[in-house]
Amino acid sequence: MKLIWKIATIWIFGGLFCNVTWGESKQSAKSPNIVFIMADDLGLGDLGCYNSDSKIPTPHMDAIASGGMRFTDAHSPSAVCSPTRYGVLTGRYAWRGRLKSGVGWGYSRLLIEPARATVASLLKTQGYNTACVGKWHLGFQLPDLAAKDYPAANVVLPKAHPHAVDYFKPLAPGPNALGFDYFYGIPASLDMNPYVFVENEKPITLPTAMVEKSAHRRQNGGGMWRGGDAAPDFKHIDVLPFVTEKAVSWIDKQDGKKPFFLYFPLSAPHTPWVPTAEFKGKAKAGYYGDFVNQCDNVIGEIVSALKSGGHLENTLLIVTSDNGSHWIPGDIPKYKHRANLHYRGQKADIWEGGHRVPFLAHWPAQVAARTVSDQTICLTDLMATALDVLGESLPTGAGQDSYSFLAALTQTKRPSERMVTIHHSVNGTFAIRKGDWKLIPGNLGSGGFSAPRVVKPKEGGPSGQLYNLRSDPSETKNVWQENPKIVEELQTELQSMRRGS
C-alpha cells in the first residue's frame, strides 16, 4: 500500500478532531465503538476532499477526511442498493444468494437468511449494543392478510391492494432477527412504497393512504417517486431529518458501559431530491447538490453527538456510499459538476463510476490524521475488519468475501492486498479486478443505466472489456485483444469465484 501525505487546507471546526502522531501505537484495552454511515447514491466527486472542483459544500466530510484516512480505491460490491447492503452486513457478495440482478422492493421478503452471520450479530456476541437507523432495503417478512389471525376490518387498506399486509402482526424476521437490538427506518428507497416508518417490527403509522407518483422523472431537478401505499402523515422531505434525530438520540443513550455499533444507511441523496428549506440553494448542482449538502450536515450531527457523549476518540467512524452517483451525462455540462469524478459511467454501471465510492475512516485512537490510502478495499470488508479490531477471526462460514483492512488503517504493519475484487452491475454483468487490471467478460456495454447498456461481442472482435486502471482509470481503451494471457487468467479466476457460490 502506498501512503501519501497531504497538508490539510480545510478548516477544522473548533477542535472537532484530534491530530494523531504518525506511527505511534495507541492500542486501547476498551473495544472501540463502530459507526458506519452509508449514503445512498453519493458520488466520489461530490466531496471536496476528493474533488477540488466540486460544486457542493461538504465541510463535515472534508473534516473527517482531514482528521483521518481517505481511501481512493474503495468499491461497493454492487453498483446498486440492495446487493451492496447485503454485502456490507454479511461480508458476502449478494450474487452468491438469490439476488442475481436488480434490487429489492418495498414488499420484498428478507434477503438475508436469519441464520446467516452479520456484522451486527457478530458484534452483539462481543458485547456490543447494535442499531440500524435509516434505509433498510433488504426486505421484511410481511404477514399476508390471507393468512391473518384478525378480522379484515381491523386493518384499513386500499381496495384491491396488490400486497395486502396485516400490519398488526410483527414484520418479522427483519433487522432485529439479524443482530440489531434496535431498528428505525423506511423499508426501501425513498422512491419506493410503502412509504412508512418502521420501528423494530412495527410501523409507526399504518400505511392506510395512497400517494400518487411524482409528475416528472426529474421534476425541476428533484427526481421522482413511485405511487403507492403510504402512512397518512408520511412526507418524503421528513425522512432524512427524522432518521437523523433517531440516530443522534440512540447515540445519546449510550452510557459507555458497553461499546456500540451503529449502522446508519442514509436515504439520501437518492431520488427524490427533497432538501429541506434551509439547504435549498446551498450548492451549485441543483436539488441534488443541496441534498448532498444536507447529508453532509447530517454527518456533522453524528460527529457532534459522538463528541458530546465522549465517544469520538475511541470510535471507528466510516463514511461511504452504496454505489456511485446517479448523475446522468447531461448533468455534467449543465452544472459543470462531475459527481463521479473522471470515472466512466454512473450508478448501476459495471464501469468505475458505478461502484468506486468515497470511503473515509476516522478513529483518533488509532488512525493518523491527514492520510490517504490507495489500497483496494470493498464494502464487504467491514465484517472482517470489525472482528480484526477486536482481535477476532471470522467464524467458519461467515464473511466469505470479507478481508480486513485494519493494517491499512493503523499502519502498524504492511497490509495484505486483496487478491481479487468482484464487481456486479444492475443487470448482472460481472467484472473482476486484480491489481491494475479489470476484466468485464461478455458485454461491451455498461450493464447498467449508461448507454450502451448491452453490446454483444462480434466475431473477430473482443469478447469483453479489459482495462489497465493505472494507466487508464477512465476506462477509455479496451485492451482485451492485446493481452490474451491476462484475459485467460482473469476469466479463470472469475469462474472459480462464481463456482464458489
Regions found by a protein language model. Name each.
Residues K2-L3, I7-A8, G15-Q465, P473-G500:
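Formylglycine-dependent sulfatase
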